[in-house]
């Protein structure tokens, strides 16, 4: 069923001309209430997809329909009530990137990425309804391509004065392309203000660019599977059946370990007191810390290759983040740092379009097979399989661990417990970054 849905979804996107070109009024016809009820997630994932005409969950089992796709609008998080992600094809005409330069490598692999991820790759700017946010600024010299009236998308008059609420909001909604990545600048950690609607008071917000977007780009550049709708924040809108929420976190952890050579440590056996829940909790927390390290480095060094290659500077960045991981005792931390340092040169490709694409092969079963190294079995997920070269169960990785190391004996600090158990975006924040204008 998932395969059939994905095929229809991709056929809609690939149609020439796009199926929704003759249906543009649909983009402005939804009320805020319908948008909220259909697309806002909650702390446990996503609410059911509501029927378009009745606004009731009567047909939620069918998942998102093609009519929904033409008005695709994902929320940045449950508190961002009205900020939507625009349709991929709608935003493509005013992309600042030559199409053949960005999408050549994706032609044969496009089905491997979820629709949400395709939106993330293609999108430069958020399209919002005129009546909801009249202050949204468009990209330079692109107003004539916007779906709404140009008057509803005024240019940013004073981009340097970020204290103005409209300017702050405009910076937030200007999403970056690959060309913008080298220009990212650090603004320092800011305390999240109430300029984006109802937020949790005192929550730290990860800059003007959503953490999820940055993480998707990093995954693409590092050959990791790009379907990470709910990796860090633990929330998102699953495609297909809204009641099926695959454990994308575990998929990312296993693939990240395979590509980076950073093992997540010896997992406790299932017959221990905490069992599988403890393993998953610890592995998720470990990958969160790995991503925090990488994000902190990129934010503070503006993704400049000459700085990324400065290993002493990078080492200083990495060693300043404590604690490293509950899995890694003091004897193992040095080896862990060396592994992180070897990752950095791979990310230079972010700045020059040369990020490699994972090698996917289609299976006759119509599903993907991911090796679960903890069970030495195969678990099915979707239509394609990344060809990994190693994994957590690789004997080469296992021999590097101290034989007497017991992960379950490592106590958690109060800060770790607070960050790991909170389950909201505050656990994912490093330092603020925003596009330079």
Swiss-Prot record:
GO cellular component terms attached to this protein's record: virion component
Keyword Ribonucleoprotein: no
Keyword Translocase recorded: no
Induction data: Expressed in the late phase of the viral replicative cycle.
Family: Belongs to the asfivirus p49 structural protein family.
Cellular compartment(s): Virion
Main location per the UniProt record: virion
The entry's keywords: Late protein, Virion
Protein's job: Together with the penton and the other minor capsid proteins (M1249L, p17), forms a complicated network immediately below the outer capsid shell, stabilizing the whole capsid. Plays an essential role in the formation of infectious virus particles. Especially required for the formation of the capsid vertices. During virion assembly, associates with the membrane and probably mediates the docking of the penton complex to the inner membrane, where it recruits the capsomers to form the penton core.
Name by which UniProt lists this protein: Minor capsid protein p49
